[in-house]
UniProtKB/Swiss-Prot annotation:
Bias (Pro residues) ranges: 46-56
Comp. bias intervals (Polar residues): 133-164, 178-187, 249-262
PANTHER family: G-BOX-BINDING FACTOR 1, G-BOX-BINDING FACTOR 3-RELATED
Organism: Arabidopsis thaliana (Mouse-ear cress)
Domain bZIP: 222-285
Name of the protein described by the UniProt record: G-box-binding factor 1
Similarity comment: family membership: Belongs to the bZIP family.
Region annotation (Leucine-zipper) ranges: 250-285
Subcellular location: Nucleus
Amino acid sequence: MGTSEDKMPFKTTKPTSSAQEVPPTPYPDWQNSMQAYYGGGGTPNPFFPSPVGSPSPHPYMWGAQHHMMPPYGTPVPYPAMYPPGAVYAHPSMPMPPNSGPTNKEPAKDQASGKKSKGNSKKKAEGGDKALSGSGNDGASHSDESVTAGSSDENDENANQQEQGSIRKPSFGQMLADASSQSTTGEIQGSVPMKPVAPGTNLNIGMDLWSSQAGVPVKDERELKRQKRKQSNRESARRSRLRKQAECEQLQQRVESLSNENQSLRDELQRLSSECDKLKSENNSIQDELQRVLGAEAVANLEQNAAGSKDGEGTN
């Protein structure tokens, strides 16, 4: 038994590190420079190398802006920092179902089960061969090493095939996932959305003041404009009515004057006709006097009539 135990080969186990070694910082003089920047008593923000994600922003980046007065502007929120390597989904596009971890767990369980079975079989074979005689020690050890190597290779091949099948899903599975996602309409997975910061505007406070005081000013100007238009319309209407009244008065005066002129013409025509009649009568009377009294008597009468007219004019 002693010789068989001494001749049995044993596998050297690799020492496993309990904790992952943290790589050194890329800037060894970081602490001194940050103390000089922040002051002797200040402690800088934690900084980790690229393999380790940090939820806090880098110390050399500015934080949120200080609060300012509302009339001059509002503080713009600084967007949150996310760990590197994350996938940000578009708001209008759904994300595929995150079925990777669920499928990997059964594969790991199967691989661990197979490895445990292979180890138990190897331990049983090793015990049986140790109990057998020392004559078959060399052959048993060689067979055991061959079987152990083949079992390890088979396990590794099986694990690689399972991982390949998990990493490369079939076309049917992809169609099924797409159809289930389109029917349910729910986005699976906890991928954070990138927040959209509001657009900066330098006239925020001015807009607040102008929006509050601009409405009354606009209303007052509009009222003044309406009143001015109304007064202009009323003055134009009054002037139009006054001119219309003057035109009507002038028209009436023209009509009255034209009627009076026509009446005067008619009177003149009547008087002229009467004058003609009187002249004709006078001529007829003179002719009859000359025929009765003679021409000398008629001449004396004319002289007497002219002298009487002159005396009346002098008196």
